[in-house]
């Protein structure tokens, strides 16, 4: 009789694992952010300015991860920062999106995090948005953004 009980437990565990296994793959894919590099943000510069790459257009609304450096924040309690391709100790952006550099991205944090030094390499991860947008709270104009983002040092 104990053999039957052992068999029933083994069978139950096997059936549970078989039922859960497909969902584990979906969860792993959902949590794996697509990697994006600064060299992949734009495809050309023409009379109308920078043109977003096909990859940026395809990944819009999806979670991406991008490596870079945190520019010095405008204020210590800011809910966002500017991610740059190279370390910058000074403000890397202008007030107009017409002068938007091709190697920065605004990162809007989903939760407060302690900012890091400008020369510490980080990976930011969040939902990609593109197109000119003005932050109603700060007046900050951006062309590329990560929303609901977080970062970690690497």
Map each language-model feature to its residues.
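N-terminal export signals
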Residues: 2-9, 13-32
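OB-fold and OB-like single-stranded nucleic-acid-recognition modules
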Residues: 30-154
């Amino acid at each position: 009789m104990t053999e039957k009980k052992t068999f029933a437990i083994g069978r139950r565990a096997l059936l549970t694992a078989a039922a859960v296994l497909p969902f584990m793959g979906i969860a792993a894919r959902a949590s794996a952010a697509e990697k994006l590099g600064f060299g992949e943000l734009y495809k050309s510069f023409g009379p109308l300015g920078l043109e977003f790459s096909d990859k940026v257009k395809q990944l819009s609304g999806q979670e991406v991860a991008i490596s870079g450096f945190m520019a010095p924040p405008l204020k210590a309690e800011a809910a966002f920062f500017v991610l740059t391709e190279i370390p910058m100790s000074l403000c890397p952006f202008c007030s107009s999106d017409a002068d938007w550099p091709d190697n920065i991205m605004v990162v809007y944090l989903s939760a407060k995090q302690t900012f890091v030094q400008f020369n510490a390499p980080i990976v930011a991860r969040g939902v990609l948005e593109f197109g000119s947008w003005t932050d109603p709270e700060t007046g900050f104009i951006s062309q590329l953004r990560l929303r609901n983002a977080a970062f970690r040092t690497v």
